[in-house]
Amino acid sequence: MRKRARIIYNPTSGKELFKRELPDALIKLEKAGYETSAYATEKIGDATLEAERAMHENYDVLIAAGGDGTLNEVVNGIAEKPNRPKLGVIPMGTVNDFGRALHIPNDIMGALDVIIEGHSTKVDIGKMNNRYFINLAAGGQLTQVSYETPSKLKSIVGPFAYYIKGFEMLPQMKAVDLRIEYDGNVFQGEALLFFLGLTNSMAGFEKLVPDAKLDDGYFTLIIVEKSNLAELGHIMTLASRGEHTKHPKVIYEKAKAINISSFTDLQLNVDGEYGGKLPANFLNLERHIDVFAPNDIVNEELINNDHVDDNLIEE
């Protein structure tokens, strides 16, 4: 029996490129033995609802074509269910942090080749209160950049749009009093921002978590304590090289469970989208989602070789 694949795509991502190449994508998957259909989202939440429906119809593979927000919605549609289908990713967004982390090609046909080759690996996801995320959760004014950056600017200059908006916001940044409990430890004090990372790539910074593992069951917790503008600029420069972890104003820890609260009204960023406000409880769900990935990722330090799946190793 042929395997069934359902593509869930954002037709506006990537300058509408996927929408134009959809017929070729369907033909390519059909030739590879997949009975394939597609669904175009129209508004926020559509991808989650369609992923849930596809689960009920017992699709073998779900393919998310869009940015990190589309991928997040698809994950939220399947995360709570047993017997989850394998997940394919076609990166079509501005930054594509998750795709970068798994070395998935940015071109559509290359990403489809990864799915067709059939190698997959199980990765951690995060649960924040009652929703899920696959790449990061963060708080602080600077973390609002990804969902406050104008779409027109993103379409013109791509990932650099975030840096432009970020530097514009730097002078406005204020520290807030936070209480962060993580695996029996507590941080109580003023901080500019915090990150909970599941991969090595966040907002295009591919070395923000230089020792990231995608399947170890731990978040990487980064807290940037109250700093002046010069110190923060220095931290950002170091972060581009993966050298920020030893800065005296940076707390860098690993944790499975994290609780964050504040008396200040603080917005959250979840996989690049608005994620509500504090307080929030975070839990790492180890190796929860099975994702198609290039076979050579097994040689990367991102994957715990003790957990390597048989289908990620060449026969």
From Swiss-Prot:
It catalyses: a 1,2-diacyl-sn-glycerol + ATP = a 1,2-diacyl-sn-glycero-3-phosphate + ADP + H(+). One of its GO terms (molecular function) is ATP-dependent diacylglycerol kinase activity. This is Diacylglycerol kinase. Catalyzes the phosphorylation of diacylglycerol (DAG) into phosphatidic acid. Is a key enzyme involved in the production of lipoteichoic acid by reintroducing DAG formed from the breakdown of membrane phospholipids into the phosphatidylglycerol biosynthetic pathway. One of its GO terms (biological process) is phospholipid biosynthetic process. Residues 1-132 form the DAGKc domain. Its EC number is 2.7.1.107. Its cofactor is Mg(2+). NCBIfam families: PRK13055.1, PRK13337.1, YegS/Rv2252/BmrU family lipid kinase. ATP binds at N10, P11, T12, S13, G14, T41, G67, D68, G69, T70, L71, N72, E73, T94. PROSITE patterns: DAGK. The keyword Magnesium applies. It is an enzyme of class 2 (transferase). Transmembrane segments: none annotated. Homodimer. Binds 1 Mg(2+) ion per subunit. This ion appears to have a structural role and is required for catalytic activity. Mg(2+) binds at K213, D216, Y218. InterPro entries: ATP-NAD_kinase_N, Diacylglycerol/lipid_kinase, Diacylglycerol_kinase_cat_dom, Lipid_Phosphate_FormReg, NAD/diacylglycerol_kinase_sf, YegS/DAGK_C. Keywords: ATP-binding, Kinase, Lipid biosynthesis, Lipid metabolism, Magnesium, Metal-binding, Nucleotide-binding, Phospholipid biosynthesis, Phospholipid metabolism, Transferase. The lineage of its organism: Bacteria, Bacillati, Bacillota, Bacilli, Bacillales. GO terms for cellular component: plasma membrane. Gene3D superfamilies: 2.60.200.40, Probable inorganic polyphosphate/atp-NAD kinase, domain 1. The active site is at E273.
